[in-house]
Amino acid sequence: MSEDTPLVVAMDGPSGTGKSSVSRRLATRLGARYLDTGAMYRVATLRVLRAGVELTDPAAIAAAVKELPLTIGTDPSREVIELDGEDVSAEIRGDAVTKAVSAVSAVPEVRDLLVAAQRDIAADARRIVVEGRDIGTVVLPAADAKIYLTASAEARAERRNQQNIREGRGDDYAAVLADVQRRDTLDSTRAVSPLRPAADAVLVDTSELTMDEVIDELSRVVAQQISTGSAQ
């Protein structure tokens, strides 16, 4: 597949499957841009938290993000995530945002705002890997390739706990597992854009695969979907 050929890859799945890491590497291999839509929801959540808005007040949440000065880069080799010109790439990964992001993401006005932005970014990129939770079903249903990454809750919790340890946030596997299960329930049962694979997505279980094995499998899946036109 030539790097001159337009390409949109939709990468969906729950948290902890390695979506961000593998999507960046896949984008690099494909000569494509990369968009982390989850980071956009995290920036919106940070905005809400800084405004002191109650997470039980959808109208106030919508008002807080109506004017969202968000900058997000699409170069897979470097992360650029800014809120009103401030680098918030580390802060949006903190516990406060992680615990609140599902509630903010469930507000229809928030999703409408960010989905429109995501579509604009994808349209401006000739080749792009877009990762999130509703890319193949809602954001880019006509994507050239659709992949749904999955892994057991235990495997995902172990990965996140190891990341927390590496980044100095402590070792608490039980708490991380409980949070993974909580977010799975919230994301799969929300009224707006519930987490589910697109009907034409290829499911890839990363539980027992190394990073290199995942990238190889995803490259194969993308090539196969492009050749057969199955993700349409």
Swiss-Prot record:
Transmembrane segments: none annotated. It comes from the Bacteria. Its EC number is 2.7.4.25. It catalyses: CMP + ATP = CDP + ADP; dCMP + ATP = dCDP + ADP. One of its GO terms (biological process) is pyrimidine nucleotide metabolic process. Disulfide bonds: none annotated. InterPro entries: Cytidylate_kin, Cytidylate_kinase_dom, P-loop_NTPase. It is an enzyme of class 2 (transferase). One of its GO terms (cellular component) is cytosol. One of its GO terms (molecular function) is CMP kinase activity. ATP binds at G13, P14, S15, G16, T17, G18, K19, S20, S21. It is found in: Cytoplasm. Residues 1-21 are annotated as: Disordered. Keywords: ATP-binding, Cytoplasm, Kinase, Nucleotide-binding, Transferase. PANTHER family: CYTIDYLATE KINASE, CYTIDYLATE KINASE/PANTOATE-BETA-ALANINE LIGASE. Belongs to the cytidylate kinase family. Type 1 subfamily. This is Cytidylate kinase. It comes from Nocardia farcinica (strain IFM 10152).
